[in-house]
Amino acid sequence: MAFLILLRHGKSVWNEKNLFTGWVDIPLSQQGIDEAIHAGQVIKDLPIDCIFTSSLVRSLMTALLAMTHHSSKKIPYIIHDDEQQKLMSRIYSDEEKSMIPLYRSSALNERMYGELQGKNKKETAEEFGEEQVKLWRRSYKISPPGGESLYDTGLRTVPYFQETIFPLLKNSKNVFISAHGNSLRSLIMDIEKLSEEEVLSLELPTGKPIVYLWTGHTFERHPEPLG
């Protein structure tokens, strides 16, 4: 058995400005920082063996802030993809036992919003029409100009989860994923076997952990909302 913790990052500066963010690398706002800290207090007693974030800083900030409250007192350390940096950052002492590996991957990045990135959501609706923007944002396979649909997002998140993260869970490793609304929705769609209609109605608030237990055969969602 193993725990899987999913956490949408805390509110970002552009969330507060009502701007499409996507892959633009925007940090957390003060509210987002507070949300990440609160989330850490909620999950502080759940076992965590490894952490995964997207390549975007708001996802990383959320994970690091949340872990400052973990009861294990273990320190996250980033495992870099670059082989030279990985070699140069090796730890040669027992200090490694007091740390938790953190892996970053663009496979977990937010849905890329293409030509909408940086634009105000209200002004975009006025420019293109509310129905068109609703199609871009809330349909499953329709993507904004130059961007990704939720379906496209799942084409990178789900294989990464199945090939990299799921084997750890099957090996009884407890995993914490700090990512984004749409990347997590695509993962939950796969985990819970949701239909297209069901995933479109799925809303994930910022800074609210979702916890699953991998039983060895299936994922069981924690029955009560956390936090």
Swiss-Prot record:
One of its GO terms (molecular function) is phosphoglycerate mutase activity. InterPro entries: His_Pase_superF_clade-1, His_PPase_superfam, Phosphogly_mut1. It is an enzyme of class 5 (isomerase). The record marks 180 as: Transition state stabilizer. One of its GO terms (biological process) is gluconeogenesis. Its EC number is 5.4.2.11. It catalyses: (2R)-2-phosphoglycerate = (2R)-3-phosphoglycerate. The keyword Isomerase applies. Keywords: Gluconeogenesis, Glycolysis, Isomerase. The active site is at residues 9, 110. SUPFAM superfamilies: Phosphoglycerate mutase-like (SSF53254). SMART domains: PGAM. Substrate binds at residues 8-15, 21-22, 58, 110-113, 121, 137-138, 181-182. The keyword Cell inner membrane does not apply. Pathway: Carbohydrate degradation; glycolysis; pyruvate from D-glyceraldehyde 3-phosphate: step 3/5. Belongs to the phosphoglycerate mutase family. BPG-dependent PGAM subfamily. Catalyzes the interconversion of 2-phosphoglycerate and 3-phosphoglycerate. This is 2,3-bisphosphoglycerate-dependent phosphoglycerate mutase. It comes from Chlamydia caviae (strain ATCC VR-813 / DSM 19441 / 03DC25 / GPIC) (Chlamydophila caviae). The lineage of its organism: Bacteria, Pseudomonadati, Chlamydiota, Chlamydiia, Chlamydiales.
